[in-house]
Regions:
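Short beta->alpha junction loops
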Residues: 45-55
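Short, glycine-/small-residue-rich phosphate/pyrophosphate-handling segment
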Residues: 47, 95, 103-145
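Short, electropositive alpha-helical surface patch
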Residues: 56-73
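Extreme N-terminal starter segment of soluble prokaryotic enzymes
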Residues: 1-4
């Protein structure tokens, strides 16, 4: 069965309480349940991992026990060459996803180290963006088989 890693970066554990006007009111657990339901309908397995620590996210990627990934790098999107390098090194496709649209926010969020190595980016669509991203990565992984 196709296995998709949903990798959540720093501060995403605070969903539902951190700046809900930007990130919404759904908690990370609620978001993951929604993704699980959608994955069930697609016939794929999803695994979730969230960390506030860059090295832990990279270590999880290095496990390479998945066919593709959804990645919300949080603030690391704008700063982490190491995360980018790990994504390139593992040779697994991923879709970048963000609840908000970083390009329409503060100037420092205009830098994106991940977008050009992702197979697609889904931004600014709230929790529904994760479902769209899952559809995209499942289609992409299916076309590689």
């Amino acid at each position: 069965m196709t296995r998709i890693l949903v990798l959540q970066g720093p501060n995403l554990n605070l969903l539902g309480t951190r700046e809900p006007e930007i990130y919404g009111h759904d908690t990370l657990e609620e978001l993951h349940r929604s993704i699980e339901r959608h994955a069930l309908g697609l016939g794929v397995d999803v695994v979730f991992f969230q960390s506030n620590h860059e090295g832990e996210l990279i270590d999880r990627l290095h496990e390479k026990d998945f066919d593709g990934a959804l990645l919300n790098g949080g603030g690391l999107t704008h700063t982490s060459v190491s995360l980018r390098d790990a994504l390139l090194a593992i040779e697994r496709p991923f879709v970048e996803v963000h609840l908000s649209d970083p390009s329409k926010r503060e100037p420092f969020r205009q830098v994106n180290f991940l977008q050009d190595v992702a197979v697609a980016s889904v931004v600014g669509k709230g929790p529904a963006g994760y479902l769209e991203a899952l559809d995209l990565i499942v289609r992409h992984v299916g076309s590689d088989r």
